[in-house]
């Protein structure tokens, strides 16, 4: 599956942002798919309050930790944050959703898609 196909599939099934991103890479992670879904579940809506980092970005960082086997992960995380910020316009859930401005920068499915694409680029 190409990274674009992973991104489209993840964004289509975006019920919980963090879980959707981890699921997109389930075939590359030595953990049961259901466990991955549970690990990412708490990160929806900026950790449930929209005040924190987007769950999709958190899912990408968690996935990067597994894919890099923990080697060089902080550098990869920096690249993920920068790439996600560039694609989406923000990294905080309420900013992405325009809670205070009334202007949505990036929808949840697009955040998931962009997180998957960014992870595929780094």
Show which residues each predicted segment covers:
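C-terminal binding/interaction regions
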Residues: 78-122
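Polybasic, low-complexity association/targeting segments
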Residues: 1-11
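Acidic-glycine-rich active-site phosphate/pyrophosphate-binding loop
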Residues: 21-41, 85-93
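Buried hydrophobic packing segments
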Residues: 21-25, 57-68, 115-119
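Glycine/serine-rich anion-binding loops at beta->alpha junctions
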Residues: 43-63
């Amino acid at each position: 599956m190409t990274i674009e196909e992973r991104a489209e599939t993840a964004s289509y099934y975006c019920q919980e942002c963090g879980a959707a991103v981890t699921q997109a890479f389930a075939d590359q992670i030595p953990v049961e798919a259901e466990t991955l879904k549970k690990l990412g579940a708490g990160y929806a809506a900026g950790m449930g309050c929209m005040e924190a980092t987007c769950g999709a970005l958190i899912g990408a960082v968690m996935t990067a930790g597994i894919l890099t086997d923990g080697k060089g992960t902080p550098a990869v995380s920096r690249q993920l944050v920068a790439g996600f910020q560039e694609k989406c316009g923000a990294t905080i859930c309420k900013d992405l959703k325009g809670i205070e401005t009334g202007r949505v920068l990036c929808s949840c499915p697009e955040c998931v898609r962009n997180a998957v694409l960014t992870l595929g680029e780094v």
